[in-house]
Amino acid sequence: MKFRVLIEQDEDGMFIAQVPSLPGCISQGKTRDEAIRNIQEAVIGYIESLKEHGDPIPPSIDEEILDVSV
C-alpha cells in the first residue's frame, strides 16, 4: 500500500511527517530519514488499529508529487 506523506521541517529543525488520508497519523524525526522511518511505523500501527476495530482502510494512492523550481 502507498500513502502520500507530507514532510516539513519546523523552526526547531525537526522533520514532521504526516499522512493526510490517515487523520492523526503524524510522526517526527531529527532527520528526514528518521521521520520517514517513524511515519512508516506509525502507518503500520494505524492500519493494524483500523483492522482490529473493523474500520475501512483508506485506499492507497498511485500518484507522485514533485517540487518544481522556477
Q: What does each model-identified segment do?
A:
Residues M1-R4, R37-V70:
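Short, charged, surface-exposed hinge/linker loops at domain edges
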Residues I7-L22:
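Short aromatic-glycine-(Arg/Gly/Cys) micro-motifs in beta-strand/loop hairpins
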Residues P23-R32:
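A short, exposed loop/beta-hairpin motif centered on an aromatic-Gly-Thr core
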